[in-house]
């Protein structure tokens, strides 16, 4: 039976950093809870509490929640409203689809002065004649009942008709309580009958007859007979058919909607779930182990993980090199390597990889390395029987390279002794040459060079005359 534990509350308090002492809202719906416990001690600051769709049969252990404003107990097995007097700040109470038949128990809510909303839809008491008038007259602080606002005229009318409504309500309540007592007795007798049937079925099983047989003289144990696989398969099919018939009978059997029937259905489903889990675990356990070596001693090649691999025969170094493509992000602690003289076995997450080697190797001289970039496992295994081989003469690669790529000569200038007279000195005056003007355009105009004219013999330079610009 699931219970309210500290671990459950902390998991449901992720929005509050998993702190439960300062928790103001928590949802514990659909947890198959049958009791309310520990919440009033661990979560004193609670304001909103969701407990809908469980198997709670009694309101308890909430009286210390002084700040609780909203309590949702819909879809449970509650039959009586009680133990809510200590919830001083309670404003909304939801008891939709429960088994509240004792309507007089709402008198305990008169002390909850801040109660404004109450939901009793889907309860047996909601079918009583005069149910709404009785609740409105009994709880004057209510503003909403079953999602409908209580008007002032409705309250006045309910207070006027309260004596007659109270009498009719008591009669209907007593009739319902007698009916509930009969249902409880019927459920109890039904449960006892099922227990007796289960005991009988256990006693009918082979190997048990309530007696013990001892023979002092007979000390030789009986030989163990191996079960016949055909008989075993037949027993399994018969057992499955019996379970299917039992399940069909359970769901086809008519039953009343009572707290006991809800509990019975829940426990039946829980047993079925546990049996399926146990059967699945049994099937997993029954899985035969992988055969790596036959009874004759022959080693098999196995690659259960379906990993890519390559085995290279390095003749120059006289060794085998195995490259196994292990997953890159797999932790090395999950890899186990075992090198034997004739084969190698690698366990990757408990899944074997086994490979038979072409020749014997030295296990003590072998080494295993793993790449940090690709994650591949490289196992180097020297051969046990060494073969003396002459090393191949290295081809003159250097000479060919020198022929193809001759060495570059150094960039040093060699100077010769030359007669200085034979050396022509450059004319520094003619370094910049005048650009010749070329014809431009279709008319080919030419710019004539201006030549300096010589002065005539009778030219007199008069200083008073300004120069021509």
Curated annotation (Swiss-Prot):
User: Sorted alphabetically, which InterPro entries does this protein's record hold?
Assistant: CS_DNAAF11_C, Leu-rich_rpt, LRR_dom_sf, U2A'_phosphoprotein32A_C
| Region feature (Disordered) | 179-290, 436-469
LRR repeat placement:
20-43, 44-65, 66-89, 90-110
- Please give an example of a GO cellular component term from this record: cytoplasm
Gene3D superfamilies reported for this sequence: Ribonuclease Inhibitor
Give the record's GO biological process terms. Answer: axonemal dynein complex assembly; cerebrospinal fluid circulation; epithelial cilium movement involved in determination of left/right asymmetry; epithelial cilium movement involved in extracellular fluid movement; establishment of localization in cell; flagellated sperm motility; outer dynein arm assembly; protein localization to cilium
Q: What does this protein do?
A: Involved in dynein arm assembly, is important for expression and transporting outer dynein arm (ODA) proteins from the cytoplasm to the cilia.
Q: Could you tell me what this protein is called?
A: Dynein axonemal assembly factor 11
User: Gene name, please?
Assistant: dnaaf11
């Amino acid at each position: 039976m699931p219970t309210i534990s500290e671990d459950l509350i902390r998991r449901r308090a992720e929005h509050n950093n998993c702190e439960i002492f300062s928790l103001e809202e928590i949802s514990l719906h659909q947890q198959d809870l049958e009791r309310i416990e520990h919440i009033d001690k661990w979560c004193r600051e609670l304001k909103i509490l969701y407990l809908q769709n469980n198997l709670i049969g009694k309101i308890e252990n909430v009286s210390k929640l002084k700040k609780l404003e909203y309590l949702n107990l819909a879809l449970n097995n509650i039959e009586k409203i009680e133990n809510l007097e200590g919830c001083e700040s309670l404003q909304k109470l939801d008891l939709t689809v429960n088994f509240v038949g004792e309507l007089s128990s709402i008198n305990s809510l008169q002390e909850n002065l801040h109660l404004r909303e109450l939901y009793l839809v889907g309860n047996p008491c909601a079918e009583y004649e005069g149910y709404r008038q009785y609740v409105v007259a009994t709880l004057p602080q209510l503003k909403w009942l079953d999602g409908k606002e209580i008007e002032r005229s409705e309250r006045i009318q309910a207070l006027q008709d309260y004596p007659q409504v109270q009498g009719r309500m008591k009669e209907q309540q007593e009739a319902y309580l007698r009916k509930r007592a009969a249902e409880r007795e019927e459920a109890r007798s039904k449960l006892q009958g099922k227990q007796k049937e289960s005991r009988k079925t256990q006693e009918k099983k082979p190997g048990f007859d309530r007696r013990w047989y001892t023979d002092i003289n007979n000390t030789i144990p009986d030989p163990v007979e191996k079960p016949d696989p055909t008989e075993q398969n037949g027993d399994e099919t018969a057992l499955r058919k019996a379970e299917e018939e039992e399940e069909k009978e359970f769901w086809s059997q008519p039953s009343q909607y009572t707290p006991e029937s809800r509990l019975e259905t829940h426990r039946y489903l829980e047993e079925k779930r546990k049996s399926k889990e146990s059967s699945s675990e049994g099937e997993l356990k029954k899985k035969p182990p992988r055969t790596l070596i036959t009874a004759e001693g022959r080693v098999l090649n196995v690659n259960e993980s379906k990993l890519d691999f390559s085995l290279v025969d390095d003749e120059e170094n006289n060794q085998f090199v195995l490259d196994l493509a292990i997953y890159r992000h797999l932790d090395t602690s999950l890899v186990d390597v075992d090198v034997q003289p004739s084969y190698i076995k690698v366990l990757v997450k408990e899944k074997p990889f086994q490979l038979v080697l072409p020749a014997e190797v030295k296990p003590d001289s072998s080494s295993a390395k793993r790449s940090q970039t690709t994650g591949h496992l490289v196992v180097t295994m020297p051969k046990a029987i060494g073969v003396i081989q002459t090393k191949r003469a290295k081809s003159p690669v250097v000479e060919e390279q020198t022929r193809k790529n001759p060495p570059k000569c150094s960039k040093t200038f060699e100077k010769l002794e030359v007669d200085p007279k034979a050396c022509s000195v450059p004319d520094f005056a003619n370094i910049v040459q005048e650009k010749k003007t070329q014809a431009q355009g279709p008319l080919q105009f030419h710019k004539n060079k201006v030549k300096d004219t010589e002065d005539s013999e009778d030219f007199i330079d008069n200083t008073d005359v300004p120069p021509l610009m």
